């Protein structure tokens, strides 16, 4: 992990397209601004983890449904 020190108004640039700027510091809270192309998703860590969990659940559900449909189709073919 790269650790950088920044002052208010200073930025960090990631690649050619992402810029992160330190906007405000109040006590333990830090406000940052993220400037990135619309095609790049930007989420808080906890939101990203929730999205990943939901995607995993949806995938597992799709696999289970696919297996059930395959079993039903096999039974229909036998009849």
UniProtKB/Swiss-Prot annotation:
Compartments (UniProt record): Cytoplasm
Keyword ATP-binding: no
Gene Ontology BP term (one): regulation of bacterial-type flagellum assembly
Key words, A-Z: Bacterial flagellum biogenesis, Cytoplasm, Repressor, RNA-binding, Translation regulation
InterPro entries: CsrA, CsrA_sf
One GO CC term on file: cytosol
Keyword Cytoplasm included in the entry's annotation: yes
Pfam families: CsrA
GO MF annotation terms: mRNA 5'-UTR binding
Subunit structure: Homodimer; the beta-strands of each monomer intercalate to form a hydrophobic core, while the alpha-helices form wings that extend away from the core.
Function: A translational regulator that binds mRNA to regulate translation initiation and/or mRNA stability. Usually binds in the 5'-UTR at or near the Shine-Dalgarno sequence preventing ribosome-binding, thus repressing translation. Its main target seems to be the major flagellin gene, while its function is anatagonized by FliW.
Entry similarity comment: Belongs to the CsrA/RsmA family.
NCBIfam families registered for this protein in UniProt: csrA, PRK01712.1
Protein name per the record: Translational regulator CsrA
Organism: Syntrophus aciditrophicus (strain SB)
């Amino acid at each position: 992990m790269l650790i950088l020190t920044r002052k208010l108004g200073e930025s960090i640039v990631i690649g050619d397209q992402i810029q992160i700027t330190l906007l405000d510091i109040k006590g333990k809270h830090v406000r940052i601004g993220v400037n990135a192309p619309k095609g790049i998703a930007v989420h808080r860590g906890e939101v990203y983890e929730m999205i990943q969990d939901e995607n995993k659940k949806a995938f597992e559900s799709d696999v289970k449904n696919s297996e059930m449909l395959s079993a039903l189709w096999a039974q229909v073919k036998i009849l």
